[in-house]
């Protein structure tokens, strides 16, 4: 089992949609090859925020998932990557995001229609998400139990 499994889906979405690569190109600098691609660092920050992180130090949660996510930059590397963002780089990031968004939207007509009981649902997209909670075996600070009295979290909602 993988804790915070939903964060893997966010990272895969960024990678497979081309966002990570486009951000890497938008933040690339001449004659400088960083250990961690700056596009990947920005995606990791977004994944960390989607995973519930509230500070740059929250990136360490992703670093503990290295077997699933691969190498994740340290907090100081994230700070350096953010410090490197100039107004021109932010504009290139904006253009890169728009390019990827257009690409993703262009792929939607290629999706097969959803069907239920051999009935075509047309443009409706069906998401079948498992609602089970992952049990946490200890009460966390100021946590309220679920309606069943246990403690846990939904891996796609954290």
Describe each PLM feature range.
Residues 1-158:
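Dynamic "connector" segments at or just before major functional cores
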């Amino acid at each position: 089992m993988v804790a915070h499994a939903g964060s893997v889906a966010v990272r895969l979405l960024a990678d497979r949609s081309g966002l990570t690569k486009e951000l890497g190109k938008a933040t690339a600098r001449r004659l400088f090859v960083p250990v961690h691609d700056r596009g990947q660092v920005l995606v990791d920050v977004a994944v960390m925020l989607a995973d519930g992180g509230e500070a740059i130090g929250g990136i360490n949660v992703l670093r503990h998932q290295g077997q699933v996510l691969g190498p994740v930059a340290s907090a100081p590397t994230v700070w350096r990557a953010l410090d490197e963002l100039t107004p021109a780089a932010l504009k290139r990031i904006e253009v890169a995001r728009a390019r990827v968004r257009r690409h993703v939207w262009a792929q939607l007509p290629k999706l097969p229609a959803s069907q239920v009981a051999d009935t075509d649902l047309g443009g409706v997209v069906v998401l079948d998400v498992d609602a089970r909670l992952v049990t946490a075996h200890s009460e966390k600070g100021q946590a309220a139990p679920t309606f069943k009295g246990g403690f846990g979290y939904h891996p796609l909602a954290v």
